[in-house]
């Protein structure tokens, strides 16, 4: 007797949910051995937040020290170690790897791929980052303490004569190891985007976030090998007497050129992905397609190209760079960034806006990053830069740009994609409390630092005189820093509570208006992401899947990648026929 196969229409792929859990303690084994991009993305993100909180505690210690002159509960040496490791952790152990956290979580889903191109290399990249970060931070437990020469490690301050001890060596070694993980992660993301897009997913149908990760990964391959080589040279100087960075040979300026040729593309390496996150979120809460898709892509490419031509604006005060060229290029890079602002505002214009927590953080990003960008244009002028270089004006600018971009957009992304990754919703009331504490605390901390810099307070000083007149501003800044620190408590509680007890998501798209493919699969997705893929005929496949009655109107309005006009009304494109249904 033979069994008769059921009719084709009755077949349905069903996910066995929930997953089998295994014995107690199995989670640790799964974390160590996993190659699932979603789990690796969560591991990246959780690890980055751990580093973020450690770096934030260091900042609170420094702000407490600066609240009043003569306080000195930290020694000068401890203060130097804190600002060095604060900058290192925030930039290289939080901001850069959290890019790969979001890329792992979202990018394969957005292009319809079952995983990244090299899953084991992906896991290897994470472990390199983790152990590299631990090596760099372990300087605090060795005799002599951690690295204390600033996160920029200017020579000769960072050589063996001026900064002896294991802390500097651990810092160099840790950044080499973590940087290798970043380089391998970039190779993986480029290969994934180029080789693993779903049928119908042309380059100009990719989500903007995917575009930005692709461009960021290319920038990483340009910038990070230079940092790695420069660090190897510094290690050779410290241990082999290589004299690469000897002042007599022009080595001091050589280090600055090498470091900043990495350092300025690095600013955009940690900005572009978060521009992408903002570009994914705003259309969903404006109930509109993204305005100016093509110009956003070209603006991203322009920023990437210009980012490798402006590094010496960090070196205006050396008197050894061509001021007009680097000043002009720095002004120029504001143009594509302004285009992005124009598109974000255009997306919201006349939209049906609602202000859930992800959208609130997007608005916070827009305001904060705009102010930071304006002070950046001011610093692009050499006469102004000469006045405020190495003062708290630069510190304020730097934090407005980077906190405004990275932290606000990180929180926006966490609140936006948390339901997709966990199958549960975060608490909106706690989310709004978190936003307002973060927004108020940040601006209270850093707005007054512009005035401190204009008054002449130098950065990296552990104390100042009562007669300097800096104390009122420093008190305000310290109060803001503690508000900012307090804002993390509702966030951590929200994540913990919601992950275990939050409202369960029963639909593919809990926000209702998602555009890209991650909103066309379950929450959380199955191991290989999709049981079936919708047709990809525009840059909004999930929206068209959920609102098929809108497709004809969208075609008539001629969105990106579509032929339009009366003559094309009945034309069926070849790639529409070939995509799987």
Curated annotation (Swiss-Prot):
Q: Which residues bind heme a3?
A: 397
As its record notes, the protein acts as a catalyst of:
4 Fe(II)-[cytochrome c] + O2 + 8 H(+)(in) = 4 Fe(III)-[cytochrome c] + 2 H2O + 4 H(+)(out)
Q: Does the keyword 4Fe-4S apply?
A: no
What InterPro entries does this protein's entry cite? Cyt_c_oxase-like_su1_dom, Cyt_c_oxase-like_su1_sf, Cyt_C_Oxase_1, Cyt_c_Oxase_su1_BS, Cyt_c_oxidase_su1_bac
Cofactor-binding details, from the entry: Binds 1 copper B ion per subunit. Binds 2 heme groups per subunit.
Q: Please name the GO terms of the biological process aspect recorded for this protein, alphabetically.
A: electron transport coupled proton transport; oxidative phosphorylation; respiratory electron transport chain
Output the PROSITE patterns linked to this UniProt entry: COX1, COX1_CUB
The Swiss-Prot or TrEMBL record lists the needed cofactor(s) as: Cu(2+); heme
Q: Which residues, by range, are in coiled-coil regions?
A: none
Position of cross-link 1'-histidyl-3'-tyrosine (His-Tyr)?
264-268
Q: Which protein are we looking at?
A: Probable cytochrome c oxidase subunit 1
Record pathway = Energy metabolism; oxidative phosphorylation
The UniProt record gives the binding positions of Cu cation as 264, 268, 313-314
> What residues does Fe(II)-heme a bind to?
86, 399
Q: What is its EC number?
A: 7.1.1.9
Write out the annotated subcellular location: Cell membrane
Please give the start and end residues of each transmembrane region.
Answer: 40-60, 89-109, 123-143, 170-190, 213-233, 258-278, 290-310, 315-335, 359-379, 398-418, 433-453, 476-496
What is the role of this chain? Cytochrome c oxidase is the component of the respiratory chain that catalyzes the reduction of oxygen to water. Subunits 1-3 form the functional core of the enzyme complex. CO I is the catalytic subunit of the enzyme. Electrons originating in cytochrome c are transferred via the copper A center of subunit 2 and heme A of subunit 1 to the bimetallic center formed by heme A3 and copper B.
Q: Which UniProt keywords apply?
A: Cell membrane, Copper, Electron transport, Heme, Iron, Membrane, Metal-binding, Respiratory chain, Translocase, Transmembrane, Transmembrane helix, Transport
Organism from which the protein derives: Mycolicibacterium paratuberculosis (strain ATCC BAA-968 / K-10) (Mycobacterium paratuberculosis)
Into which family does the record put it? Belongs to the heme-copper respiratory oxidase family.
Q: MF terms per GO, please?
A: cytochrome-c oxidase activity; heme binding; metal ion binding
This protein's membrane topology, according to the annotation, is: Multi-pass membrane protein
Q: What's any one GO cellular component for it? A: plasma membrane
């Amino acid at each position: 007797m033979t069994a008769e196969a059921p009719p084709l229409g009755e077949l349905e792929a069903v996910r066995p949910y929930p997953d089998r859990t295994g014995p107690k303690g199995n989670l640790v084994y799964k974390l160590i051995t996993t190659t699932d991009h979603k789990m690796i993305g969560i591991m990246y993100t959780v690890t980055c937040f751990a580093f973020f909180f450690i770096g934030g505690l260091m900042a609170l210690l420094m702000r407490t020290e600066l609240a009043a002159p003569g306080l000195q509960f930290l020694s000068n040496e401890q203060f130097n170690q804190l600002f060095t490791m604060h900058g290192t952790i925030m930039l290289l152990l939080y901001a850069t790897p959290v890019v790969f956290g979001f890329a792992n979580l979202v990018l394969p889903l957005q292009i319809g791929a079952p995983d990244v191109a090299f899953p084991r290399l992906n896991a290897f990249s994470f472990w390199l980052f983790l152990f590299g970060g631990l090596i760099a931070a372990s300087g605090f437990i060795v005799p002599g303490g951690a690295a204390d020469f600033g996160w920029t490690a200017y020579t000769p301050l960072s050589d063996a004569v001026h900064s002896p001890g294991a802390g500097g060596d651990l810092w160099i070694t840790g950044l080499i190891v973590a940087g290798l993980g970043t380089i391998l992660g970039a190779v993986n993301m480029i290969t994934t985007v180029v080789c693993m897009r779903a049928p119908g997913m042309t380059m100009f149908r990719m989500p903007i976030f995917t575009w930005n990760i692709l461009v960021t990964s290319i920038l990483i391959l340009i910038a990070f090998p230079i940092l790695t080589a420069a660090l190897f040279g510094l290690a050779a100087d410290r241990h082999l007497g290589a004299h690469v960075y000897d002042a007599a040979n022009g080595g001091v300026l050589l280090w600055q050129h090498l470091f900043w040729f990495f350092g300025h593309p690095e600013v955009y390496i940690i900005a572009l992905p978060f521009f992408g996150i903002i570009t994914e979120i705003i259309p969903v809460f404006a109930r509109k397609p993204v305005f100016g898709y093509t110009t956003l892509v070209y603006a991203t490419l322009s920023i990437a190209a210009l980012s490798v031509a402006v590094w010496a604006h960090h070196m205006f005060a050396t008197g050894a760079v061509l001021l007009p060229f680097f000043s002009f290029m720095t002004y120029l890079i504001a143009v594509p960034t302004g285009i992005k602002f124009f598109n974000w505002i255009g997306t919201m214009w006349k939209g049906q806006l609602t202000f859930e927590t992800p959208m609130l953080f997007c608005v916070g990003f827009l305001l904060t990053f705009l102010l930071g960008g304006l002070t950046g244009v001011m610093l692009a002028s050499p006469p102004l830069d000469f006045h405020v270089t190495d003062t708290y004006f630069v510190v304020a600018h730097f934090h407005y740009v980077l906190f405004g971009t990275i932290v606000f957009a990180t929180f926006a992304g966490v609140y936006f994609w948390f339901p997709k990754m966990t199958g549960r919703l975060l608490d909106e009331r706690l989310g709004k409390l978190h936003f307002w504490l973060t927004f108020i605390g940040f601006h209270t901390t850093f707005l007054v630092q512009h005035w401190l810099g204009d008054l002449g307070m130098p950065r990296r000083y552990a104390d100042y005189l009562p007669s300097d007149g800096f104390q009122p501003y420093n008190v305000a800044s310290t109060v803001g820093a503690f508000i900012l620190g307090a804002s993390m408590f509702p966030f951590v509680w929200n994540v913990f509570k919601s992950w275990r007890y939050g409202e369960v998501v029963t639909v593919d798209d809990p926000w209702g208006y998602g555009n890209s493919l991650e909103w066309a699969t379950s929450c959380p997705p199955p191991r290989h992401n999709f049981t079936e893929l919708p047709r990809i005929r525009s840059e909004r496949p999930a929206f068209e899947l959920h609102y098929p009655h809108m497709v004809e109107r969208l075609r008539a309005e001629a969105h990106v990648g579509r032929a339009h006009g009366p003559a094309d009304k009945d034309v069926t494109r070849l790639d529409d026929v070939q995509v799987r249904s």
